[in-house]
From Swiss-Prot:
<keyword id="KW-1003">Cell membrane</keyword>
<keyword id="KW-1015">Disulfide bond</keyword>
<feature type="disulfide bond">
    <location>
        <begin position="65"/>
        <end position="106"/>
    </location>
</feature>
<feature type="compositionally biased region" description="Polar residues">
    <location>
        <begin position="423"/>
        <end position="440"/>
    </location>
</feature>
<feature type="topological domain" description="Extracellular">
    <location>
        <begin position="195"/>
        <end position="215"/>
    </location>
</feature>
<feature type="topological domain" description="Extracellular">
    <location>
        <begin position="29"/>
        <end position="140"/>
    </location>
</feature>
<feature type="topological domain" description="Cytoplasmic">
    <location>
        <begin position="315"/>
        <end position="339"/>
    </location>
</feature>
<feature type="topological domain" description="Extracellular">
    <location>
        <begin position="276"/>
        <end position="290"/>
    </location>
</feature>
<dbReference type="InterPro" id="IPR050332">
    <property type="entry name" value="GPCR_2"/>
</dbReference>
<keyword id="KW-0732">Signal</keyword>
<feature type="transmembrane region" description="Helical; Name=1">
    <location>
        <begin position="141"/>
        <end position="166"/>
    </location>
</feature>
<comment type="function">
    <text>G protein-coupled receptor activated by secretin (SCT), which is involved in different processes such as regulation of the pH of the duodenal content, food intake and water homeostasis. Ligand binding causes a conformation change that triggers signaling via guanine nucleotide-binding proteins (G proteins) and activates cAMP-dependent pathway. Upon binding to secretin, regulates the pH of the duodenum by (1) inhibiting the secretion of gastric acid from the parietal cells of the stomach and (2) stimulating the production of bicarbonate (NaHCO(3)) from the ductal cells of the pancreas.</text>
</comment>
<feature type="transmembrane region" description="Helical; Name=7">
    <location>
        <begin position="367"/>
        <end position="390"/>
    </location>
</feature>
<keyword id="KW-0807">Transducer</keyword>
<feature type="transmembrane region" description="Helical; Name=4">
    <location>
        <begin position="254"/>
        <end position="275"/>
    </location>
</feature>
<keyword id="KW-0812">Transmembrane</keyword>
<dbReference type="GO" id="GO:0048167">
    <property type="term" value="P:regulation of synaptic plasticity"/>
</dbReference>
Amino acid sequence: MLSTMSPRLSLLLLWLLLLINAAHPVGALPRLCDVRRVLLEERAECLRELSEEKKALGPKTASGCERFWDNMSCWPSSALAQTVEVPCPKFLRMFSGRNGSLFRNCTKDGWSETFPRPDLACGVNMNGSFNERRHAYLLKLKVMYTVGYSSSLAMLLVALSILCSFRRLHCTRNYIHMHLFVSFILRALSNFIKDAVLFPADDVTYCDAHRAGCKLVMIFFQYCIMANYAWLLVEGLYLHTLLAISFFSERKCLQAFVLFGWGSPAIFVALWAVTRHFLEDFGCWDINSNASIWWVIRGPVILSIVINFIFFINILRILMRKLRTQETRGNETHHYKRLAKSTLLLIPLFGIHYIVFAFSPEGAMEVQLFFELALGSFQGLVVAVLYCFLNGELEVQKKWRQWHLQEFPLRPVALSNSFSNATNGPTHSTKAGTSEQSRSIPGANVI
């Protein structure tokens, strides 16, 4: 007896899952057209195999249960009194990312009902109240990261313009900062472009007219994300090198850093795109149901986070040792305050907060989304403020220009080294020239 529950259940699952999908901000759930296409492809493949089996049998009648399509899965032919196992339907794995199995018995009356229930076996939540709460949560999250990326984008553009405009600020350290700013800008822009492509008003546009363009957008998005992590790692590597190595060529290192920061992400993203094309080519490539393929990108990102965290710990150890040699015993409170300030300055520059959820379980996904999207979207804003707008030398330059224009409106503005040397802002001095060889570090003025 064929199951009469399967078609209704499949439609119910689709309806409930698509309610969640309508508000998902990061493109982790498929569109209805993607699900429909997967179902049609699997149905066509199942019917083709059934036709070939019938041709092979000829006029003979097969005993047992023949292959059939139940609107969710393709069940292979089976002998009587056998239990057949098939994996969870592909469209359910697209939503849940969970691998499971469904079973049917071949009886003298035909196929039995499916067991266990597909929603339970395949990890699909059928709780309507939970879905509504998640829907509202994801909407709020989307608003938060849109505000975060917008504010970060505006501040980063201004900060980048400032660093590019002042020739006195052109040094290896600030060149690295500028590349980091550009990576944050690209990350924000790629998020806006991705949302515009993945969530248009018309599903047909998404599914048919711009399928190739949509995949290119996702390739660009993944590249921008990886490039941002790469430049966070470059910041950590550069500062660690300043403290750990006495002499090295900063100019040659800058060339290597640029090649690594922009080149290494391209290699991994290209490998991911080729793998997706041949092994998981459905939808807009915004769904990562195959964990093995996703690790082509996730693996290097987690590795960069771990390496940067190791740099962070070692840098703090070196700073603590240096401070202990400089401080007197009676000034322990001041010593710890300066170390705390240095630590807080390094956290956004290195992206240390990412280590919290680098190895998070699936159950912590919503909390991880909050930290990485809602709070992480403001990281560019924080970095721009700390390493540009609160920069000590920039503060003096602005005040000096204002005073000079008021007192001598017809004379050109010239900044002497005495003003630069007198700076004592909340972050490190960014003066170029011989000061680079002094191995000053971010936050040196507050240590």
